[in-house]
Amino acid sequence: LKELRSQSNRVAVIKHEALHLLFKHLFRTDIKNYEPTLFNIAADLVVNQFIGSWKLPEGAVTLNTFPDLGLEQNQTLEWYYEKLSKLQNNGENTAPKSSEALSKIMGEKEQKRGDHSKWGTPPTAKGQIDGIAAETELDRMIIQARERTPAKYWGTIPGEINTLIDILIEN
């Protein structure tokens, strides 16, 4: 966070990481079926739509990063991943600006983009148990945060996030 000079950048990055937790991107058991960098970009496209008025750091991936790809708002990680995968395979002709942006991102060092190689359920039995315990604790914390939030503020939470929280509470 040292390189994030403004409070707005810091808040945006913390919100970004919290949203990855809320959407449970790091607990995906199928994560090994995806190309890691494309998965990360698709996950960032999902969460960065919910940052609001906070300023993401320069170079953050948003829908505007891929101007001629026809990305729609509020789609799933899988939907964005599929679009990015197609772009990577044959996008130079159909979406040249987006293809150039993706090539640039794919060439960046992991440290700059964030290393999510540890995401996904570990293959060992102990790792799986630890992952389940961590996810259960995360669920508890999300529900507790919702319960501590005065009802008058619930309307300020985006509908998609409210739905995720409602599903957690029901389960």
What are these language model-derived features?
Residues K2, A18, A43-S53, N171:
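An amphipathic, basic-hydrophobic helix/alpha-beta surface used to engage anionic
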Residues Q49-N171:
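Negatively charged
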Residues K24-H25, E35, D130, N171:
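Poly-acidic low-complexity segments
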Residues L1-L4, H25-N33:
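Glycine-/proline-rich flexible loop or hinge segments
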Residues K32-D44:
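Active-site metal-coordination segments of metallo-dependent hydrolases
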Residues L1-V13, L38:
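Short pre-active-site segment immediately N-terminal to the catalytic Zn-binding motif
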